[in-house]
């Protein structure tokens, strides 16, 4: 039986000239700017044009392009191998769909049709669900399938914030970095979100908190000094906090060894390689930090690949509703943006 796995990620510009078009795609997404097209399009043009110079400097730090596609391809290859080794009576093929740059859903659907699967599994590379990330990617894929009159049995793994293999992957990476440390502050850093999104029922912050809670329990370190914070704030809106930058400043002044964990990113990209590794380290150094360590994103970590593989193969064990498979976790009823509570 042929099965196609669609891996969703954000994407990133493949050269400096594509930074502004990438930003436009990001801000032209209704899940990011919830405005009518007639207003959203020109505003996305304006924002992307104004932010392009700073963003270009960031990508120049990375050699002129984002590494996210190459790294996602490595994850895709590892997952495809694991799936085919584990479930030998099925033929799995993984396809990458980026939301804001290539490869886009409109192009990838042609490759999926050529593969001619009997089943499609949608797997966001976002462990914690947000309408702005997983939700947007899933909707785009469904819209493209509808536009192309493509109807195949499709199942969705909406999120996996407390999956044990995912938790184990983070735990092991953290232990590698802290096993010989003393007087350190473990800072779990996730991408921020405007407070208004959470108030409208987005479960992202709650799910991030559940991930961190499980990892801390799994570490099982007495009197562990840890905190969850949020990075990458932009614009005038009030964002969820506390901010990672503020926490770094505070603990640098206390002469703590800073240990950063990117809890919501599973691939290295500008927010980890530049924001965490360069910009925040400079802030830490300027405030007296003597030691600064960053735990890597999970990438092709064996436990993370196992997590995705088992989520796909064993999905019927935690089936919530027709074609929707959350991993043994249900968001509280006030999070109306959660697909488990608002399933079509």
From Swiss-Prot:
Q: Where in the cell is it found?
A: Cytoplasm
- Residue numbers binding Fe cation: 191, 271
For this UniProt record, the keywords arranged alphabetically read as follows:
Cytoplasm, Heme biosynthesis, Iron, Lyase, Metal-binding, Porphyrin biosynthesis
Which BP terms does GO give this entry? Answer: heme biosynthetic process
Q: What class of enzyme is it?
A: lyase
What is a single molecular function from GO for this protein? metal ion binding
What domain of life does the UniProt record list for this protein's source? Bacteria
Q: In which pathway does it act?
A: Porphyrin-containing compound metabolism; protoheme biosynthesis; protoheme from protoporphyrin-IX: step 1/1
Give a Gene Ontology cellular component term annotated to this protein: cytoplasm
Instruction: Name the catalysed reactions.
Output: heme b + 2 H(+) = protoporphyrin IX + Fe(2+)
Q: Does the keyword Lyase apply?
A: yes
Q: Which family does it belong to?
A: Belongs to the ferrochelatase family.
Among PANTHER family, the record links this protein to: FERROCHELATASE, FERROCHELATASE, MITOCHONDRIAL
Query: What does the UniProt function comment say about this protein?
Result: Catalyzes the ferrous insertion into protoporphyrin IX.
| Name of this protein | Ferrochelatase
